[in-house]
Amino acid sequence: MERPGARRLLSLGLPTVWGAVAITYKLACPLAQEENMGARIVSSAVFFAVGTGLILHVRRALLRELRQMREVAGAAQNVLLRPLPSRVEGLALAAGRLSASRGASVGGDLYEVVATDHGVRVVMGDVRGHGLAAIGTVAAVLGSFREAAHDEPELPLVLRRLERALGRHLRERARAEHPAGGGTPPETPLAEEFVTVLLLEIDGDGGISALNCGHPWPHLLSGTARPLTDGEPLPPLGSFPLPADLPVLGCGRLLPGEALVLHTDGMEDARDVAGTFFPLRAVLAEAARVPPVSPQGLIRAVCTRLLRHTGRLPADDAALLVLRNDRSRIPLQQPEPDRHAPTMSGG
């Protein structure tokens, strides 16, 4: 295995050798001193070869650095937005994402699925913006969720933990970006910084509970595709403080064979050259006609159709998360007028 010190020595030595060859030729070779056409052609060929060698060496060095940066970014992505297991508590899972930046592996979309004593808990969110600032916000929200999902018995308490974690992160960022405040945190976080967040809880009976802060509602696939509910979401986290009362929305039950599709607004907002939005619901309805839906197959189909629709990378990051109920049965409950009718429960 080549050592880093040897690589650095080689990277410095080769340009030095090429430069020494050019200077030696110019100063010591009699042919370089002549003024006739043949001598000039030979001199031009020598310096062209030297220049080409230098360019190729720099190109190889840049490609090597790019590979290393992508490896580091991929490792960071797997830690931050770690790959989901294929199955959690009888639910089949798959997730996919498309970045608005070519070659990028990190962005402002976030998702996680964890099995807890309170049921399977799911988060999907979208940070306003891109780049390193968005990645730091994703880390703050996801880190808080991974702890709060196990610790807190109710979804509203999980959401309040996310709000506090986001507030701390934004205040620390503001203090770091504006150190003139003498170490005193600003009174308000960064302006126009917010995160849309969707929290779901799926219990052992398939019952779905939700809290939504400005995020698109999931689609339920059961022979067709329709929004899980039409309830009014709360404002995104960071834009306004959460209200004192956080009512949990009951969204019916996820029956065996049915699937939920969570997504960020980059899916619905993607447009073609004519400005037509991507028909996400129609694509999902087409996939739902032949149950059971394959989570991985659905991810591939939607991403392929989206790229075909736009003809290029989407203008915004887009993420998709699919959960299919593979449980063999759901315990009997009291009859419900409509198994998917939204109901409100206090939280």
Residue ranges and their predicted role:
Residues R87, G103:
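Portal/gating segments that form or line small-molecule/metal binding sites
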Residues A104, L110-A174, T276:
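Primarily the active-site beta-strand->alpha-helix module of PP2C/PPM metal-dependent phosphatases
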